[in-house]
Structures are given as C-alpha cells and as structure tokens.
C-alpha cells in the first residue's frame, strides 16, 4: 500500500467520572516507524471500506481556520492537534454517550492525494501468552470497529474549495448523535448526498427506458447493464462516472444516457460514489415490515411473482425448497 505519513500526533481523552472528560496531550509527534505505518495502513483500509457521509466546512469553522494556518506553516502540526483535541473534548462532553479514547491526527499521502484523518479510537483488553506460556493482559486499539472518524481530502479542499465532498465521516454505531457531535467539532455541514445521487440515477434509468418504450425483458436487461457497471465501480473502489456509464450502455434513440440525464435535469454529478443498497434496486425488489421480509429478483415479477395493486396482494408461485420444508413441517403435513 502506497501510504506515506507526513505527520502524526496522538493524544488521549480520559473519562474520570460521569461529568469529567480530561485531556492528556502528547508533547511530541509520533515517529513514522514501521509500527505506526502498519497502524495507519490498517486504519486507512478500514475507513475506506466503510460507508461514509460527505460534508464541507462552514465559513466560521475554527478547525478549518487552524488547519489553514498549519498548512501555511504559521502553526506547527503538533500545536494544531493539541488545540483541536481540546475543542473535541468540549464538544464530546456535551453528549451523554461521551467516552474516552485515543485521539489521532494523521496527515498522509495516498496515491498522490493528501489527507488529514482525525479519529477517536477505543482501547480493548485481551490476553496474550508469552514465550514461557504465561498469560498476561494486553491492550490494543480497536481499529476494526472505529466509528468516530473523519477525513479531509486536503488536495480537493485546497484546489477546489467550492467542492461539497472533500470532507467525509462515518455515521457510527450509536447513530445520528455521533454524526452531530463530529459535525459540531468540525464546524461542518453535510455536502454531497450519495444516496440522493444514486436514487436520481435509478430514476433517470427508469425514465430513459420508458422514453424508449422498452419491453419488460429489454428494460430489465438494460437495468442489469447499469447495475453491472456500477457494481464493478463499487468493487474497485471507484466512483460512478456518467460519461463512462453512457459509453457502456446502448444508445436508446437520438440521445445517449448522459445527454438524456443532463437535459432532463436530474442534477446528477459528473461522478459520485456508488451506494450498494440503492443500486440493488436495479435488479431486486426488497422490503420488510410488520414481521414480513421479502427479497426477490426483479425478473421474477410477472413470471412467478404477481402483484395485484387493487388489493395490494403479492402472489408467489413456487416457494424456495427450504421455505417449503419449514411450512410443511409446521403444518404437520
């Protein structure tokens, strides 16, 4: 992995009691040795694999102002990280779920892009066996379950300040509150809505097929082509590019898919991240509620599965063998 660490600092938040969250500040930067590089490579991998929300700094963001000073050399990285940890403590202390943790600030380069990653990492206890086969307790950073993480694409931020996607953050296991606290600390607002972009893409595909008056099978085959491209991009960690997608798809009528999307005003970005859950709707129908969960391939609608809109009734002809076996055993037949 081509990841080069420029500067990295660690500090700590210690929860003394229910009302007190203390700060322990390190006096020097961490050396970028092999252990540190391995840790950052793992954190980068874990973060890159997770679903993220996008944002941008507010005009009055203290963190953004301090980061600009650090980038210009008016303030060193250690001082920047120490002051930011204090602000982080002040914001986190407002929430009842506040816990301590190791606060990490790392400025690094990956594939010619500069990043600043900020995270609060929890420590976990485990057991280890030494060479004499004695057991002892050990502590480790729980990187795989890190959920308080934000990353700033410094290259994008400095070269394209009007961007709505240079800042990313995780939603977190405890839900919306983590997002709120981190956005308050960063003094940022949500930017590019990835799910909305993917929903817009699905609508554009549906309208494009309808405009061309495709039959059911032709329409589903076209949707499958869209899904195949998008899924390949997702697996490769790449974004959906409208122009590239249009080149992959057969032209329906006089306009290709990109021209149609632009003229019809779907407000799609030239490229945007793929959202797995939304894209799945291209090839499947799924829903749950009231103790019922249903998921089936779109091709089955009208063949083995029939929906009566008037009575809101779904009829399934031919149940899966494992489901049929359960039903038979439960009915005593």
Swiss-Prot record:
PANTHER family attached to this UniProt entry: NUCLEOID-ASSOCIATED PROTEIN YEJK, PTHR38772
One term of GO molecular function: single-stranded RNA binding
InterPro entries associated with the record: Nucleoid_associated_NdpA
A Pfam match: NA37
Keywords noted in UniProt: Cytoplasm
Family of this protein: Belongs to the YejK family.
Source taxon at top rank: Bacteria
Localization terms from the record: Cytoplasm, Nucleoid
Record's GO cellular component terms: bacterial nucleoid; cytoplasm
Presence of the UniProt keyword Cytoplasm in the record: yes
Name under which the protein is recorded: Nucleoid-associated protein YE1421
Entry keyword annotation includes Cytoplasm: yes
Predominant location category: cytoplasm
